[in-house]
Amino acid sequence: MAEDQRKVWLIAEFLEDSFVGCSVFYDYEDRERVARSYRIVDYNTGKLLHHVFVSRAFLDDHAEAEIVPALQDLALVGCLRIAGTRRVTVKSQMIEIEVGA
């Protein structure tokens, strides 16, 4: 579990570094399907900019040292910018953007 916590922190740090001027909040979601939920909020306005779900499979399939490179390879930051406030789910080898909203 300690390794999982480190992975969760690495993802939060990656998002904070990628979205300067924003706060990143994370918490548990459905343990069966989604491991963590991250909300990226504009620090000045409090407006929700992005909502990311990171699957249990992603955390399980990537070693700690692979987390950030895998997010970069999946182009997570670009996907978030395209998605806006729509939900983005990071799966083991792909990213899904919620349709609509």
Regions found by a protein language model. Give the residues of each.
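Amphipathic, interaction-prone secondary-structure segments
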Residues: E13-F53
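C-terminal interaction segments
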Residues: T89-I95
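Acidic, low-complexity, intrinsically disordered interaction modules
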Residues: Y43-P69
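Unusually extended, aromatic-enriched hydrophobic runs near protein termini
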Residues: R31, V88-T89
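Negatively charged, low-complexity tracts enriched in Asp/Glu with abundant Ser/Thr
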Residues: M1-Y28, D60-V77, R81-T85, E96-A101
